[in-house]
Regions:
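N-terminal Rossmann-like FAD-binding beta1-loop-alpha1 element of flavoenzymes
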Residues: 7-31
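Flavin-dependent oxidoreductases
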Residues: 18, 178-180, 187, 191-253
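Glycine-rich FAD pyrophosphate-binding loop
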Residues: 25-44
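Hydrophobic anchor at the start of a short beta-strand
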Residues: 30, 117-118, 203
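Dinucleotide-binding Rossmann-like beta1-alpha1 core, especially the glycine-rich loop
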Residues: 49-129, 138
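Helix-loop-beta segment of a Rossmann-like dinucleotide-binding subdomain
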Residues: 84-92, 127-165
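Helical element adjacent to the flavin cofactor pocket in flavoenzyme catalytic cores
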Residues: 145-179, 188-194, 201
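Single conserved hydrophobic/aromatic residue that forms the stacking wall/gate
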Residues: 251-263
Length: 263
């Protein structure tokens, strides 16, 4: 069986579901194609849920533009879709003059990217904001707009809204091959899956860990995935709203090409 749509979105993680929800506003036929048997089973299910404010990306990059705007929009999305979003704020801690210079650079990045209310604060303000921060911290970049979500909850809310507005959802449908033919005026892409084929005019690659494979099959840009892993250690079980704290710099170990730091 083959179904035809204007747009096919490969991947039902938080990114694919959010894209589907936004595109459902338009008069388009859309299908989300997911390899797993449910949504958000890839990277979306196993990350910290931090909504970055946008002071890290280099000004002028696409990431800088979408990062700041996305953080701003999360408050609106939370109200519209009914998921929990907490603006806890965050601090990047510094311990010496070198760290302070790096924090100033992050502040300049953030200001250029449109991040609101960034400031460099001293020890008194650090411990007022987070009493359990290191007593050795001499300065910090304070960013009030950083927030937290549950990525699984956001993905569910976004896709439920999209499906309610006519978006089709195929699960247990890993893309095995992509045939490319014709122009954008026709059903240019044909996606082969175990549960049936999907034809579409436009293909959106939101496949997360499998994005490079989808890009290769579609004859698009070849790229290599660079994997990252963060480890979160729970050291305090007291129920309270926690603020994310970061060291100023990440250091490469002498033994291997590993980055050592706290996330």
């Amino acid at each position: 069986m083959t179904e035809t749509f204007d747009i096919a979105i490969v991947g039902a993680g938080i990114t694919g579901c959010a894209i589907a929800r936004q595109l459902a506003r338009y008069d388009l036929s859309i299908c989300v194609v997911e390899a797993g048997n449910d949504i958000a089973l890839g990277a979306s299910k196993a990350n910290g849920g931090l909504v970055h404010a946008g002071y890290d990306p280099a000004p002028g990059t696409v990431k800088a533009q979408v990062n700041t705007r996305g953080c701003e929009l999360y408050g609106t999305w939370a109200q519209e879709l009914g998921f929990l979003f907490r603006r806890t704020g965050s601090m990047v801690l510094g311990f010496n003059d070198e760290d302070r210079a790096h924090l100033e650079q992050l502040r300049r990045n953030g200001q250029a990217n449109g991040v609101p209310e960034l400031s460099i604060v001293g020890p008194d303000r650090i411990h007022e904001l987070e009493p359990r921060a290191s007593a050795d911290a001499t300065c910090a970049l304070w960013c009030p707009s950083t927030g937290f979500v549950d990525p699984f909850e956001v993905a569910i809310a976004a896709l439920e809204n999209a499906v309610a507005n006519g978006v089709a959802f195929m699960r247990s449908a890993p893309v095995e091959a992509i045939e490319v033919a014709g122009s954008s005026d026709d059903a240019r892409f044909t996606l082969a899956t175990p549960t049936g084929n999907v034809r579409c005019r436009y293909l959106i690659n939101a496949a997360g860990n499998g994005a490079a494979d989808i890009s290769h099959m579609a004859g698009a840009e070849e790229f290599q995935m660079v994997w990252r892993q963060g480890n979160i250690v729970v050291m305090d079980k007291e129920p309270r709203t926690l603020m994310p704290l970061y060291p100023c710099l990440l250091y490469t170990s002498d033994a291997a090409d590993d980055l050592i730091g706290v996330d």
